[in-house]
Amino acid sequence: MDVILDILKFSVSGILFFLATFFVLKNLLDNREKERRHQMRIETGKILTPIKLTAYERLVLFLERIKPESMVVRIQYPAMKAGDLHLMYIQQVREEFEHNVSQQIYVSEDLWRFVIAAKESLLQFINTCSESVPNDVPAVELSKILIEKYNETENPPIDIALVVLKNEIKTLA
């Protein structure tokens, strides 16, 4: 009977020692893993933050470049007709968007939705304005209408997208 008690004492103390060692080592390894993940997040942030800022800059440029007053200055030619200008505006907005479509992986889904909404709204706006002008009149007539009506618009989608973009940039700091 003493032998069984001795075996039980050693077994129980061995099991307790094993369990204590196991939990201490598990805790130590878990802490090291948490620290490693934390360091990886810091390193990833150091790499991604400049890339994200570049994406935000490019989206600001995109939104500013597709504003009617900006496109009028860049695109209009002296002998151009309104119908040709209409097509060039549409083409320019689409090209600018396609050039910046990859930026969506660096910004929030909400911001990207605002950018798309701004683009789509502008395309619709350009089409609507061009319907009010005959295709064969000088392009300057369409340009005037675009700028006048755009300036009359309360909270243009491009401006809303820019506000959302700027607010998202502030969350990076």
What does each model-found stretch correspond to?
Residues 1-3:
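N-terminal hydrophobic targeting signals that begin at the initiator methionine
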Residues 5, 9, 14, 18-22, ...:
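Conserved non-transmembrane functional hotspots
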